[in-house]
């Protein structure tokens, strides 16, 4: 059995060894919940990696958005180059859920664009969980949504090994039954082709091709093939071909499901007719009968997920199977930035049910559609074996449930101490701030400014520009790729000051920032709560001259607590440095690390976004262009079908640009 092998150019220092030892002891002692309360820049990810190595169990790392999930995945892949570090996030490039607006009698059909590469990464994650134990899956909150039954998925896998006697036609039938399609012209994920005694399969979980060579009815060779060059990568003794989709329904189960759906329809129709809702009764009858016809004929229909309760054989109200059910019983959960992620877990179910309730009431869906849902918070926690909450500012619930198992990590390996905090009056604050900014610019350092409103951020940005400051404004309308590029430009010195509202808190690794200015710090609320203030102040905690200025005329409870906590940590850090003779050292970190790595991932995952293609066409790797052209051509044809000719023309122009780039014009 392969074990985790942590590889890092440094060893645990400061209070990392103590934190690692305490967490390992707590988990091995059978404790269910523990918290790593780690200050910004103390190497929390490295400590967690060391714990994972020592515990040696399959681990789910949960982040609250795709950006942080990708950063964590990149870091953990560097720490564990020889282990399976997987990425599991929502595979939608675009998603408009099905909805009904009664006031205007408007029905909005579900529309979605699935990202093929993310789908492959999701399949890769579940495959790794079936085949090995040295697995870390970094996921977003989408992992609590239904994912098909693990037992059925595993049961449907097709085992192949050298020397196995099997008729080639049987394998072709099996492949078709697990959603692979035959295409003898063009290979790809979820496809297979036959050339005489050679069968080639494009697995759903990777971009290599599996070639199976037959000698009569016996498997003679199994090889991995490069999909572009056709060269043999390596030979295999055996391989499992997992289904092309996570939702696998055996034929016998499908028959029973159709009967159950028909019975529910009969009951629901009668119920609606009894209450005088004749339009709704006719609507549900017509829509469900059409779906049943499709299910019986082809085993699939649009919105099939709404029948997942029947297809999986679950009882009403039972939780759906999710990614968590693919883990073994002794799995470990790590929740990053838990003060944000834990409330997300609580909120997903309620938002989903509110939309479904309207669809059910107006005859668009059967009541069982409500069971196609994310896990409720209590269902999620029931499935958790053991958990580590990770945050610089854990929520009250995490601290309470962890009891006395709160492990503090305050010392930075670099010896850098928490920022010095000063509170200044609002009168003359802009001129005061301008002077501070100019001092930082002279030292080639960066500044973050956080305001309470979008209007103030815009006005402040304009004022600073008028005074010759190179400044950018980060607002909510900027997409994740542009956001990462702006942060990248800040680190590289393309500009010196970044102004924002609520976009400067968790997960920003910006060692060049020496000053954080918080405007209206005394305006109590979510953006100026104790945890938000500590997180924002922490953005300057990676710089040896880190400072935070709070502009306020009154001292709020949140300000007092945030300042006291920061001063407490500073005291511990200063004492440690003095005791060990440590001189704080600046963090030397290439700007191409986590942020740039994610930027590259993002471009690949979102390359079918026209704006992204246009902005980055010169930077696209040549090997990715053919695949991108295929995707854009499919979008162009779809746009033409919908009579969206302007959109189709834009896509055509982008395709021409890409083809010109490919031939070197």
Swiss-Prot record:
Cited InterPro entries: Helicase/UvrB_N, Helicase_ATP-bd, Helicase_C-like, P-loop_NTPase, UVR_dom, UVR_dom_sf, UvrB, UvrB_inter
GO cellular component, one term: excinuclease repair complex
SMART domains according to UniProt: DEXDc (SM00487), HELICc (SM00490)
Molecular functions per Gene Ontology: ATP binding; ATP hydrolysis activity; DNA binding; excinuclease ABC activity
Biological process according to GO: nucleotide-excision repair; SOS response
Positions with a binding annotation for ATP: 38-45
Entry remark concerning the domains of this protein: The beta-hairpin motif is involved in DNA binding.
Chief place where the protein resides: cytoplasm
Family the entry assigns: Belongs to the UvrB family.
Boundaries of every Helicase ATP-binding domain copy: 25-412
Gene3D superfamilies tied to this protein: P-loop containing nucleotide triphosphate hydrolases (3.40.50.300), UVR domain (4.10.860.10)
Native species: Nostoc sp. (strain PCC 7120 / SAG 25.82 / UTEX 2576)
Protein name listed in UniProt: UvrABC system protein B
Limits of the UVR domain: 626-661
Keyword match DNA damage: yes
Keywords recorded for this protein, A-Z: ATP-binding, Cytoplasm, DNA damage, DNA excision, DNA repair, Excision nuclease, Nucleotide-binding, SOS response
Residues spanned by motif Beta-hairpin: 91-114
Alphabetical list of HAMAP family matching this protein: UvrB
Compartmental location: Cytoplasm
Subunit and partners: Forms a heterotetramer with UvrA during the search for lesions. Interacts with UvrC in an incision complex.
Domain Helicase C-terminal residues, every copy: 429-583
Task performed by this protein: The UvrABC repair system catalyzes the recognition and processing of DNA lesions. A damage recognition complex composed of 2 UvrA and 2 UvrB subunits scans DNA for abnormalities. Upon binding of the UvrA(2)B(2) complex to a putative damaged site, the DNA wraps around one UvrB monomer. DNA wrap is dependent on ATP binding by UvrB and probably causes local melting of the DNA helix, facilitating insertion of UvrB beta-hairpin between the DNA strands. Then UvrB probes one DNA strand for the presence of a lesion.
């Amino acid at each position: 059995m392969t074990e985790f092998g942590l590889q890092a150019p440094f060893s645990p220092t400061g209070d990392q060894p103590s934190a690692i030892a305490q967490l390992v002891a707590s988990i091995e002692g059978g404790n269910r919940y523990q918290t790593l309360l780690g200050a910004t820049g103390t190497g929390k990810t490295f400590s967690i990696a060391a714990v994972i190595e020592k515990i040696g169990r399959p681990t789910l790392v949960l982040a609250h958005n795709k950006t942080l999930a990708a950063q964590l995945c990149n870091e953990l892949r560097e720490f564990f180059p020889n282990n399976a570090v997987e990425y599991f996030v929502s595979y939608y490039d675009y998603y408009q859920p099905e909805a009904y607006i009664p006031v205007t009698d408007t029905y909005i059909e579900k529309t979605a664009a699935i990202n093929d590469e993310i789908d492959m990464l999701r399949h890769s994650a579940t495959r790794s969980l079936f085949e090995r134990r040295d697995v870390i899956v970094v996921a977003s909150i989408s992992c609590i949504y239904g994912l098909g039954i693990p037992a059925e998925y595993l049961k449907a896998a097709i085992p192949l090994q050298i020397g196995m006697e099997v008729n080639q036609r049987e394998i072709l039938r099996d492949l078709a039954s697990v959603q692979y399609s035959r295409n003898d012209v063009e290979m790809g994920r979820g496809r297979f082709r036959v050339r005489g005694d050679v069968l080639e399969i494009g697995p759903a979980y990777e971009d290599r091709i599996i070639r199976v060579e037959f000698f009569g009815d016996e498997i003679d060779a199994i090889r991995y093939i490069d999909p572009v060059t056709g060269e043999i990568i390596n030979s295999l003794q055996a391989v499992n071909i997992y289904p092309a989709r996570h939702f696998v329904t055996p034929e016998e189960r499908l028959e029973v499901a159709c009967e159950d759906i028909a019975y529910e329809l009969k009951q629901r129709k009668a119920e609606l007719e009894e209450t005088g809702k004749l339009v709704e009764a006719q609507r549900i009858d017509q829509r469900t009968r059409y779906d049943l016809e499709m299910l019986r004929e082809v085993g699939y229909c649009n919105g099939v997920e709404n029948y997942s309760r029947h297809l999986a054989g679950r009882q009403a109200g039972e939780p759906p199977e999710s990614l968590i059910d693919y883990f073994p019983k002794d799995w470990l959960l790590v929740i990053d930035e838990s003060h944000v992620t834990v409330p997300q877990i609580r909120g997903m179910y309620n938002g989903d049910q509110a939309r479904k309730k309207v669809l059910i009431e107006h005859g668009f869906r059967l009541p069982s559609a409500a069971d196609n849902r994310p896990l409720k918070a209590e269902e999620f926690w029931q499935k958790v074996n053991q958990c580590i909450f990770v945050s610089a500012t854990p929520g009250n619930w995490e601290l309470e449930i962890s009891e006395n198992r709160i492990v503090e990590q305050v010392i930075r390996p670099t010896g850098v101490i928490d920022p010095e905090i000063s509170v200044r009056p609002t009168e003359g604050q802009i001129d005061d701030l301008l002077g501070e900014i100019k001092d930082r610019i002279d030292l080639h350092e960066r500044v973050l400014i956080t305001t309470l409103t979008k209007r103030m951020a815009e006005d402040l940005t304009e004022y600073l520009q008028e005074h010759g400051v190179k400044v950018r404004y980060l607002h909510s309308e900027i997409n994740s790729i542009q956001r990462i590029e702006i942060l990248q430009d800040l680190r590289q010195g393309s500009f010196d000051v970044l102004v924002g509202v609520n976009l400067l808190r968790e997960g920003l690794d910006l060692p060049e920032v020496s000053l954080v200015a918080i405007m209206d710090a005394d305006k109590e609320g979510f953006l100026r709560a104790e945890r938000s203030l500590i997180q924002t102040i922490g953005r300057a905690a990676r710089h040896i001259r880190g400072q935070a200025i709070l502009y306020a005329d009154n001292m709020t409870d949140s300000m007092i607590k945030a300042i006291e906590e920061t001063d407490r940590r500073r005291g511990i850090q200063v004492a440690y440095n003095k005791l060990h003779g440590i001189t704080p050292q600046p963090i030397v970190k290439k700007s191409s690390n986590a942020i740039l790595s994610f930027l590259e991932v993002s471009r690949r995952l979102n390359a079918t976004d026209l704006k992204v293609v246009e902005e980055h066409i010169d930077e696209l790797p040549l090997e990715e262009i053919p695949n991108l052209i295929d995707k854009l051509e499919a979008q162009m044809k779809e746009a033409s079908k919908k009579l969206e000719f302007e959109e189709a023309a834009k896509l055509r122009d982008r395709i021409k640009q890409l083809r010109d780039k490919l031939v070197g014009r």
